[in-house]
């Protein structure tokens, strides 16, 4: 028998979260962002739950080919555009839309021989300072693209750096609108946080929700997933494979960094950092045992963690342990954002970091 660890993908939750994003976006069309292998869930596994979107936005040609292989015939957008001039031929064959964020990509298009003009999203660097044309150069980039026979429609996009925080979007939005007010083209400016927190200000033709589709709050800890009416789409679970009874003064695991203050029963769960569970989690990290919230104690090992069984005295060998997501026993939810906070990171990273050795399965009945 294999180890009892399992990552479960919840298709119904994906549909629910997509609908939540669509309701927030009012009249805009929705790109379902499935980059990074659908935030670690697997593109093939999320397709059924997200096929109600108006398009799929992703990172590279390999992911685009997988979406097309699933039968999707609608829009597909390469969020970073092409990395090599040879990629443009495949863009033509797969009928892809792609981002243009630098002069080199315009040069590639200008030299490309194609019978079918391509749809592009021209990206502005409105203040995030990653990809995109500076505002003062955006108009000239648009003019150059518009003159190319290789280019069909030009849409306009930017990306917010602080839509999830106190700084907000006002400055970047002003920069974008000032530089694009006289340019034709559909607009796409709202990511997950902007879609939920700034829907009125960021109404455009397209929104680009990512993390909210997977049930994580884009502005945690200010708001949790329940506040935004999001449901977890991934559950990482395992089982207890051992029980130990400690007395006062006993220590646990490598480094002996946890010492029992009195009699304590602990459970050993089959999960560790080799499975993608973050090693930076330490004593106090929340877990569910038999659907009841308790805490991890000691350090994360390669293949095991130890948990405090005080709240669940009935726990035994084989009892369910939920690392994040929804307990199959009680239905209780342990938000991935809480676990990420304990590890000093974000839910995005935990989803993407689930190791290849962890098997995936759809939720029962899905």
Swiss-Prot record:
A biological process (GO) of this protein is:
D-alanine biosynthetic process
Q: Which GO terms describe its molecular function?
A: alanine racemase activity; pyridoxal phosphate binding
Instruction: Tell me which EC number(s) this protein carries.
Output: 5.1.1.1
Positions bound to substrate: 130, 302
- Pathway where this protein functions: Amino-acid biosynthesis; D-alanine biosynthesis; D-alanine from L-alanine: step 1/1
Which InterPro entries does the annotation name? Ala_racemase (IPR000821), Ala_racemase/Decarboxylase_C (IPR009006), Ala_racemase_C (IPR011079), Ala_racemase_N (IPR001608), Ala_racemase_pyridoxalP-BS (IPR020622), PLP-binding_barrel (IPR029066)
Keywords, in A-Z order: Isomerase, Pyridoxal phosphate
May I ask which residue range the UniProt record assigns to the signal sequence? Answer: none
Catalytic site residues?
Answer: 35, 254
Catalyzed reactions per annotation: L-alanine = D-alanine
Gene Ontology annotations for the cellular component aspect, listed alphabetically:
cytosol
Question: Does Isomerase show up as a keyword for this record?
Answer: yes
Record's superkingdom? Answer: Bacteria
Carrying N6-(pyridoxal phosphate)lysine, the residues are 35
Q: Which cofactor does it need?
A: pyridoxal 5'-phosphate
Question: Which NCBIfam families does the record associate with it?
Answer: alr (TIGR00492)
Summary of the function given for this chain in its UniProt record: Catalyzes the interconversion of L-alanine and D-alanine. May also act on other amino acids.
The entry sums up its family as follows: Belongs to the alanine racemase family.
Which HAMAP family does the annotation name? Ala_racemase
Q: Which protein, by its recorded name, is this?
A: Alanine racemase
Q: Which organism is it from?
A: Variovorax paradoxus (strain S110)
Q: What is the lineage of its organism?
A: Bacteria, Pseudomonadati, Pseudomonadota, Betaproteobacteria, Burkholderiales
